[in-house]
Amino acid sequence: PVCFDAKECHTDTFPLANVHPHQVAFMEQFEKQEGIAFLLISFTHREEFYYLRFSDLEKFWNRALDGGRKSFRYEELNPEYILPKKHGILVPYLDVLQKDLADRE
């Protein structure tokens, strides 16, 4: 099973306030039940979509809870999870979902 939410960002800094605590809690429980949870983030100014694995979201979330940044920067993201542009497909996340599955093994 797959659980995701779509978000939009107009700068290179994504505020974690755009994600609600209940969403993080739900995704955490979903992953514990062997589901795949992630965010799809549209960085509109770059015309790019990014697949943010729950494990990365959780890392940024916990950093904020521990008193650190309440956001993350584009530069902190793994470029391997930028969605490739494909003709005729607006949000081609399936290839990156396959990479996520492979990286978990």
Regions found by a protein language model. Name each.
Residues 1-11:
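Conserved catalytic cores of phosphodiester-cleaving nucleases, focusing on short active-site segments
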Residues 5-6, 38-40, 101-105:
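Charged, low-complexity, helix/coiled-coil-prone segments
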Residues 9-12, 56-58:
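Short, surface-exposed beta-strand-loop junctions and turns on beta-sheet-rich folds
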Residues 11-21:
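Active-site-adjacent loop/helix micro-motif of nuclease/hydrolase catalytic cores
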Residues 20-23, 31:
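Short, compact, well-ordered microdomains
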Residues 28-58:
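Nucleic-acid nuclease catalytic cores
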Residues 50, 54-105:
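Helix-rich interaction surfaces within compact, conserved domain-sized segments
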